[in-house]
C-alpha cells in the first residue's frame, strides 16, 4: 500500500499536469436581468443603474466566504468533493442556517 493512508487511492504517478483554464471575470455571468429578478423576488419595484455592479461585488464576497468554509470542511474530511452538507455547515457557521439539504 505504499503509505497513501486510508483507501490507498493513489491517482497515478503524477505525470504531466493538464493546463487548467484561469477563470476570471465570471462574475459578469450574473446578468442584469438575473439581478433584477432577485430584486423583484425581494419586493423591489425600481432599481438604480449603479446597483448591478454593487450587487455583483457583494455576491462575490459572500460566495468566496461560503466556499472557503465549505472547502475547509471538505479538506478536514480528507475528501476531494464538496458535498451539499459542507455548504450547509459553512452557512450555519456564518449564522445563515439552511434547511432542506440533509442533516
From Swiss-Prot:
PANTHER family linked to this entry: HISTONE H4
DNA-binding region, residue range(s): 17-21
Family, as annotated: Belongs to the histone H4 family.
Entry-linked Gene3D superfamilies: Histone, subunit A
Protein name, entry field: Histone H4
GO CC annotation: nucleosome; nucleus
Source organism, top-level taxon: Eukaryota
Xref: CDD domains: HFD_H4
Annotated positions of the N-acetylserine modification: 2
SUPFAM superfamilies to which the protein is assigned, alphabetical: Histone-fold
Nucleotide-binding among keywords: no
Modified residue annotations for N6-methylated lysine: 80
PROSITE patterns reported for this sequence: HISTONE_H4 (PS00047)
Biased composition (Gly residues): 1-14
Keywords per UniProt: Acetylation, Chromosome, DNA-binding, Methylation, Nucleosome core, Nucleus
Region: Disordered, residue numbers: 1-20
Native organism: Olisthodiscus luteus (Marine phytoflagellate)
Binding partners and assembly: The nucleosome is a histone octamer containing two molecules each of H2A, H2B, H3 and H4 assembled in one H3-H4 heterotetramer and two H2A-H2B heterodimers. The octamer wraps approximately 147 bp of DNA.
Chain segments annotated as transmembrane: none
Stored Pfam families: CENP-T_C
Residues with PTM N6-acetyllysine: 17
Amino acid at each position: 500500500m505504499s503509505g497513501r493512508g486510508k483507501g490507498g487511492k493513489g491517482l497515478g504517478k503524477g505525470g504531466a499536469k493538464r493546463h487548467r483554464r484561469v477563470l476570471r471575470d465570471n462574475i459578469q455571468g450574473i446578468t442584469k436581468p438575473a439581478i433584477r429578478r432577485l430584486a423583484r423576488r425581494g419586493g423591489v419595484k425600481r432599481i438604480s443603474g449603479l446597483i448591478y455592479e454593487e450587487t455583483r461585488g457583494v455576491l462575490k464576497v459572500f460566495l468566496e466566504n461560503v466556499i472557503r468554509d465549505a472547502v475547509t470542511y471538505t479538506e478536514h474530511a480528507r475528501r476531494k468533493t464538496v458535498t451539499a452538507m459542507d455548504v450547509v455547515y459553512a452557512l450555519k457557521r456564518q449564522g445563515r442556517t439552511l434547511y432542506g439539504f440533509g442533516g
